[in-house]
């Protein structure tokens, strides 16, 4: 999914986490970042940090060449780029020799969906890079990316502003919202307190039966035997009044809700 670097973030640390994440297992973990999204005011600082830490930001011609190798003719991911080194991907796409120390290929992108191959999931050392005019546009773009390439999966945000984190967490269609951590490692529970797992559910929005990090309890059926511990009159709190059945049901429901809430408080 996308990774948003907010203006309140430590930019150098955020970029380090993203590149460390993307290069872990050569980008093959499905929770790894697929794109970086920033506001225009952050573009200079983020681009500088990316270059300083080993990002190869592609020229327009390099962008065009590599874009032809991301997807196959049927629209699915080209397996030739999956888990390959920067040098191998560069050779495959005809980009020439990578810059010294290049760890990840970064391609500027302006759209999402058909015709924008960098907006797709890329299980390799390739990141899309979106620059948006303001935070509202960033949020719309992140939602758009998730709905296109991974609804219900994972969203990363780098920020010290708690309000921004909460706002994005409520709005994005993701089962995992990872804050100030490498997404590939945070998503599987290595750098967060999420359940350790390599199978990540996407919930109903992603067509999955679970939004959990899938563990043993998600894969077994449990039979439960329940013994009665009280009678209906005890729940009502006394003898049943002489009223119609509909009214009895309504009062019973209210009493049950009241008792449940009382236990939770």
Feature-to-residue mapping (PLM):
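Conserved C-terminal structural/oligomerization subdomain of aldehyde/semialdehyde dehydrogenase
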Residues: 94-259, 263-265
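ALDH superfamily catalytic-core signature
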Residues: 1-113
């Amino acid at each position: 999914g996308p990774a948003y670097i907010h203006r309140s973030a430590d930019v150098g640390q955020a970029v380090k986490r993203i590149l460390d994440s993307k290069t872990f297992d050569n980008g093959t973990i499905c929770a790894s970042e697929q794109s970086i999204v920033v506001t225009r005011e952050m573009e200079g600082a983020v681009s500088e940090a990316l270059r300083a830490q080993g990002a190869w930001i592609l020229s327009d011609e390099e962008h065009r060449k590599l874009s032809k190798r991301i997807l196959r003719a049927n629209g699915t991911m080209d397996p030739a780029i999956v888990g390959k080194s920067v040098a191998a991907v560069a050779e495959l796409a005809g980009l020439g020799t990578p810059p010294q120390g290049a760890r990840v290929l970064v391609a500027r992108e302006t759209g999402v969906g058909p015709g924008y191959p960098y907006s797709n999931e890329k299980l390799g050392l390739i990141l899309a890079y979106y620059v948006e005019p303001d935070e509202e546009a960033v949020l719309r773009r992140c939602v758009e990316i998730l709905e296109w390439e991974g609804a219900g999966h994972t969203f990363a945000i780098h920020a010290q502003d708690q309000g921004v984190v909460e706002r994005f967490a409520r709005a994005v269609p993701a089962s995992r919202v990872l804050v100030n951590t490498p997404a590939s490692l945070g998503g599987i529970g290595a750098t967060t307190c999420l359940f350790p797992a390599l199978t990540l559910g996407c919930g109903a929005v992603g067509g999955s039966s679970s939004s959990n990090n899938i563990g043993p309890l998600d894969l077994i059926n449990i039979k439960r035997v329940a013994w009665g511990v009280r009678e209906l009159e005890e729940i009502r709190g006394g003898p049943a009044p002489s009223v119609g059945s509909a009214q009895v049901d309504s009062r019973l429901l209210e009493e049950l809700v009241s008792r449940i809430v009382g236990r939770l408080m």
